[in-house]
From Swiss-Prot:
This is Ribonuclease Y. GO terms for molecular function: RNA binding; RNA endonuclease activity. Its EC number is 3.1.-.-. Residues 36-55, 63-83 are annotated as: Disordered. It comes from the Bacteria.
Length: 487
């Protein structure tokens, strides 16, 4: 009985659970249905709202399209109207062109009848005249451009040369052909002369230098055209005077020592010249020859100093022109190298210098510059032109080269005298140390052609009557002035 009661109780409990579950399930079902309906309602409202918005947008777009269609329709009508107007104008223009063509043909026929020329003949005549005018204008334009280019080139050249001179300004000391050796007392003169003059004869024989012993107190003058031999004699004599032992054997010994010292000095001077100019890689023999130039002069100007100055001028001008500075300086330093041995070889120093440069491995540009620096050949490289210019600048610098004062003044006076001898000359001035004669002519007595002939005549007379180094420039100036006053 108890078991049946438990079973009945369990069944009732199970039925109750099932009932409760059914109720709970129905409740959840109803809630789910309600939620689904609410979701559907919400989505429907959103869809309707979106649909309305799209509909409104479409309506707005349709209205815009309608407005554009109306605008296009108006524009089309306007274009059609303009096309009609243009067509009418084209027709009028065509008619006008036809009328003008008829009038033109009539005028051409009338002109042909009046001039007796056909249209082609008149055209050819006009073209020929135009060609002549164009040719004349072209020639004038070319002449003007050439003149302008020459002025610019001259201006640039003056700037470059001025810069070079300013940057390479050096002092000049004129060299002479004598040296003076100081003596401690006048008794030393007798010892130098020696018994029956044997000492002085030995020294003169060994050195080739004349010893002048006169009334000059405590001094002996050495005279000779070869500066190297004169320097050897000077050093030897100074050593003999300092030593006090003067006899032929001692003289020979001192001359030999002096010779070695001068050789060493020559080498040192050559090396110093290359260092001063920044020229490297020279053959040792060329360096020695450069050193020998220290003892050479040209019109009183030391040739080594002149060569160093030319090298520096070439370097500055080459830098300004943007060309090879090293080659220009090298050519400038070696341009007078032939003067170191020109008394030992036959021929001008430019030819000797070029041969020496070729012998010791210098480049063709350097050799060409050496060979052309005196104008014997036409320069074909910029370095050769620079060497010519620098050589002229160095030589023409006031005080660089020296003549005797008397001959110098006489030459200047003679230059002015020759120029003043012509009737059309008003004034004449010898300037640039006698390297230029500037002549003012009377404009009423000399025209342009006469001035050209005058310059030629004066230059010929100077060539015939005067001896001078280098060349003299003759400049004839003709000036006409017209003066009026505005009141």
């Amino acid at each position: 009985m108890i078991a049946e009661a438990k079973i009945t109780s369990a069944e009732e409990a199970a039925d109750k659970i099932i009932e409760d579950a059914k109720k709970q399930g129905e409740s959840m079902k109803r809630e789910a249905l309600l939620e689904a309906k609410e979701e559907i309602h919400t989505q429907r409202n959103e869809l309707e709202k979106e649909t309305r918005e799209r509909r409104n947008e479409i309506q707005r777009f349709e209205r815009k399209l309608e407005q554009k269609e109306e605008s296009l329709s108006k524009q089309q009508k306007q274009l059609e109207q303009k096309e009609k107007e243009i067509a009418q104008k084209d027709e009028k223009i065509t008619n006008k062109e036809q009328e003008l063509e008829k009038i033109y043909q009539q005028q051409v026929e009338e002109l042909e009848n009046l001039s007796g020329l056909t249209t082609q003949e008149a055209k050819d005549m006009l073209l020929n005249r135009v060609r002549e005018d164009i040719s004349h204008e072209t020639a004038m334009m070319i002449k003007e451009m050439e003149s302008r280019a020459k002025e610019e080139a001259d201006k640039k050249a003056r700037e470059i040369i001025t810069t070079a001179i300013q940057r390479c300004a050096v002092d000049h000391v004129a060299e002479s052909t004598v040296s003076v050796v100081s003596l401690p007392n006048d008794e030393m003169k007798g010892r130098i002369i020696g018994r029956e003059g044997r000492n002085i004869r030995t020294l003169e024989t060994l050195t080739g230098i004349d010893l002048i012993i006169d009334d000059t107190p405590e001094a002996v003058i050495l005279s000779g055209f070869d500066p190297i031999r004169r320097e050897i004699a000077r050093l030897a004599l100074e050593k003999l005077v300092s030593d006090g032992r003067i006899h032929p054997a001692r003289i020979e010994e001192m001359v030999e020592k002096a010779q070695k010292e001068v050789d060493e000095q020559i080498r040192e001077e050559g090396e110093q010249a290359t260092l001063d100019t920044g020229v490297h890689g020279l053959h040792s023999e060329l360096i020695k020859l450069l050193g020998r130039l220290k003892f050479r002069t040209s019109y009183g100007q030391n040739v080594l100093n002149h060569s160093i100055e030319v090298a520096r001028l070439c370097g500055v001008m080459a830098h300004e022109l943007g060309t090879d500075v090293n080659t220009a300086k090298r050519a400038g330093l070696l341009h007078d190298i032939g003067k170191a041995v020109d008394h030992e070889y036959e021929g001008p120093h430019v030819t000797i210098g070029a041969e020496l440069g070729k012998k010791y491995g210098e480049s063709s540009n350097v050799l060409h510059a050496i060979a052309t620096h005196h104008g014997d050949e036409e320069p074909e490289t910029i370095e050769a032109v620079l060497v010519q210019a620098a050589d002229a600048i160095s030589a023409a610098r006031p005080g660089a080269r020296r003549e005797t004062l008397e001959s110098y003044i006489k030459r200047l006076e003679k230059l002015e005298e020759i120029a003043d001898s012509y009737k059309s000359v008003e004034k004449a001035y010898a300037i640039q140390a006698g390297r230029e004669v500037r002549i003012m002519v009377k404009p009423e007595q000399a025209d342009d052609e006469t001035s050209i002939n005058l310059a030629r005549d004066i230059s010929k007379q100077i060539e015939a009557e005067l001896d001078y180094p280098g060349q003299i420039k003759i400049t004839v100036i003709r000036e006409t002035r017209a003066v009026e006053y505005a009141k």
